[in-house]
Structure formats: structure tokens, C-alpha cells
A protein has these predicted regions:
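Conserved glycine-rich Rossmann-like NAD(P)H-binding loop of the short-chain dehydrogenase/reductase
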Residues: 27-35
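SDR active-site strand-loop-helix element
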Residues: 8, 32, 70-74, 109-115
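A short helix->loop->beta-strand "cap" motif at the edges of active sites that frequently abuts
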Residues: 100-108
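Residue-level detector of anion-binding/catalytic polar loops
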Residues: 28, 69, 106
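NAD(P)H-binding glycine-rich loop region in Rossmannoid oxidoreductase-like domains
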Residues: 37-41, 47-94, 101, 115-123
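Nucleotide donor/acceptor-binding cores
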Residues: 2-3, 107
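N-terminal Rossmann NAD(P)H-binding glycine-rich loop of SDR-like oxidoreductase domains
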Residues: 3-27
């Protein structure tokens, strides 16, 4: 039986490439998406699409429950207000970690950041 990996940010540039790679390597993939992605973007290995966002604790628990690994790719590097970075990147990550702690405490957790985190001229995200 294939191991299950839960992925946030799966419909973005990095996340979509990651999901396809995981599928090629034999993982069963469960993704979080704000809305149902186009069928062409979804590899056959996706076993479930959990509709919700980083602020939806219930959806995050559904996403990670029973996962062997959780890869958190979701985040923002552009926002209208500085506080939006805090909500999406800090609070969203905190909620993902809380869901893992509650619903998949043995899962490996990988957090993928952005080049913008170390290049202040690219984004206020840094």
C-alpha cells in the first residue's frame, strides 16, 4: 500500500510540480485546495482533494489525518498589507502544525519556504 502524503499549496507553481513528482514516485497524494482544481492539473495519484484554506482548522485536520508525511508549501509572497503576511504565513503555518499534532502526530513534516524569504528586494515577505 502506498504511503499517503498531504500537501498544502498543491495548485501553485512549486506545489503542482511537487505533487506530480510525488505521484511518479508512488505516493498517494491528498491536497488542500480552495476550490476543485482542473482535472488536467490533478495526477491519478491524488486520492482526495480537501476543499478549504489555511484558516480552516477542520479542513486541515481532514487533510493530514492518517498521512505519513505532510508537506506545507502554501504561503504568500505578495500582499496588500503587511498583516496579510502574518495571517497567511505565520498563522496558517501554526494551524497546519496544530492539525498535524492532533490528527497525524507521527507524520513527517516538511515546510517549504520561498526564495523571497532571503531576498528582501523581492518581497516584503522577507
Amino acid at each position: 500500500m502506498a504511503k499517503v502524503v498531504a500537501v498544502t499549496g498543491a495548485t501553485g507553481f512549486v506545489g503542482s510540480h511537487l505533487v506530480h513528482r510525488l505521484a511518479r514516485e508512488g505516493w498517494s497524494v491528498r491536497i488542500l485546495a480552495r476550490r476543485m482544481p482542473q482535472a488536467a492539473l490533478v495526477p491519478d495519484a491524488i486520492i482526495d482533494v480537501v476543499i478549504g484554506g489555511l484558516g480552516d482548522a477542520r479542513a486541515l485536520r481532514r487533510l493530514v489525518r492518517g498521512a505519513d508525511a505532510v508537506i506545507h508549501v502554501a504561503g504568500i509572497v505578495k500582499a496588500r498589507h503587511r498583516a496579510d503576511f502574518q495571517v497567511a504565513n505565520v498563522e496558517g503555518t501554526r494551524l497546519v502544525l496544530a492539525a498535524v499534532s492532533e490528527a497525524a502526530p507521527m507524520a513527517r513534516f516538511i515546510h517549504i519556504s520561498s526564495l523571497a524569504a532571503r531576498e528582501p528586494h523581492l518581497s516584503p515577505y522577507a
